[in-house]
Amino acid sequence: MENQDTEQSQKRSGSEVEKDDFKRQKVVVPEGMTKREYKRQLKQQRWEETKDEYKQKKREKKKAARERRKERIKEAEANGETNEELYNYHQMKRAKVAPQEQIDTDVKIIMDCEFDSLMNDKEIVSLSNQITRSYSAKKHSTYDVQLDITSFNKNLKKRFEKAIPQYDKWTNVTFVENDKLEDILPMDDKQALSKYVYLTADTDEVIDTLEPHHTYIIGGIVDKNRYKNLCLNKAQSLGLKIGRLPIDKFIKMNGRQVLATSHVFELCCKWFENDKDWGKAFNEVLPPRKVKGKLTHGSDPEKSIEPSEVSEQPVSSEQSEQPVLSEQPVSSEQPVLSEQPVLSESSDEPSDEPSKGADH
């Protein structure tokens, strides 16, 4: 029995031992700080000391996984097989290639990031990753949907400068350092203002069509539903039209029908790519378990497959988002936050894993 215990203790990794030692440390809280704040600071410090080693191990794991997949694909091709992995591999390679020319849509999307002060550090990180994914969706779309990131002048900008410094090389994306949304709106021209629509989940006005020469505003906030009617109240105070995507027709959600900022932008891009069919757009963008049914007859929900026929798949976790601020470990081995955005090693594209919370 003692030999088994000895073997198990020897198998424990150095990181696990270090973590246990860290937990056993007697916490002496400095004056003026709460115990929770101080423990968070200690975790931040520990993460800063170990993040390079963690990132290196993660890169090595990804590289090994790619090599294993390549070997399986080579073997399948040599045997004349056409398995699902081989098909997905070639589909993935094609998806990474951005179109040389994009079709103009005459539609603009504004991500209103004026809510900076309402988010904590982790939520700022999540929003920055959502913006990065939105840029990837825009870059790979066959249709050009204009994208402006506004009120880009506080914590969000600091996050980009620290973790995503290459953002200033992004093409066809405008970062606007205004203080308030009304600073960039034609407030004195009612006719021009009528072509601005603020997207919010808190309205019955459904948007069936993205109209040319119109601007659609997405609230750039990750708040886990803390702030009710935030975008609605702001739109009404500015005299803007409001609307929401036809969420209830195509997806099943408990409570408020709220989508992530990146999902809203991706849906707009996919709407154009799928012959202006919201049903097909929702099927491409959202996790399968949230879609009411995989539509086979356009966007008519009456002709869709029953929800029970759609295979349930887990929603991707936020673990891969790798944020920078308020770094906290998710488990005993993997911290939540990271110095870099979620980009693939072979390109400047982010991962497609969702992060919920925006009021849309």
UniProtKB/Swiss-Prot annotation:
Residues 8-24, 33-55, 68-77, 297-306 have a biased composition (Basic and acidic residues). GO terms for biological process: tRNA N1-guanine methylation. Residues 94-293 form the SAM-dependent MTase TRM10-type domain. Residues 56-67 have a biased composition (Basic residues). It comes from the Eukaryota. Gene3D superfamilies: 3.40.1280.30. Residues 1-77, 291-360 are annotated as: Disordered. Residues 307-324 have a biased composition (Low complexity). Keywords: Cytoplasm, Methyltransferase, Nucleus, S-adenosyl-L-methionine, Transferase, tRNA processing. Its EC number is 2.1.1.221. S-adenosyl-L-methionine binds at residues 199-200, 219, 223-227, 231, 245, 257-259. Belongs to the class IV-like SAM-binding methyltransferase superfamily. TRM10 family. This is tRNA (guanine(9)-N1)-methyltransferase. It comes from Debaryomyces hansenii (strain ATCC 36239 / CBS 767 / BCRC 21394 / JCM 1990 / NBRC 0083 / IGC 2968).
